[in-house]
Amino acid sequence: MADRQLTMTAEVDLAIRRHGEETYPHECCGALVGRDSVVSACVPLPNTTEEGPRRRFLVRPSDYRDAERQTAALGGELLGFYHSHPDHPARPSQYDLDHAWPTFAYVIVSVVATNDLARRSAEQEGGAKAADMTVWYLEDDRSSFEKGTLNHAENSHPDAAPAVHG
């Protein structure tokens, strides 16, 4: 498969990183909105897993429909999803592979504890920092992911607020 690319503005990059830091030590998740492989906004979604939000995320069908509605209201298309990996690398897990849908981009951000206390306490203010961010695409045969190239564009406006819509 040819190298697939996804471009996002710096404001979207920052919004995803902040979401991961704010939800640490749990996984965050959200939708990627844009056109033609350019992400112009992200929509945070609730992580409703019952398996333990520290290692899993789940988007309910009703939240998916809400994301589609918000995407349409923003004038974009649903390009994919993002989620964080607390204290783990920004690469897909077997769980991610088992639950991925074709055609979507999957952005993963690694979020790491800044100290041992943060690793033990979800309430530690400023206790986590977003690290690597990667993008992945499900292979056509669904057997694995292919790593894509994540590019960054300039912000849409120098004074623009982070592109989180919720």
Task: Please report, for each region that a protein language model flagged, where it lies by residue.
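Conserved beta-strand-loop surface patch within small alpha/beta domains used
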Residues: 1-78, 86-166
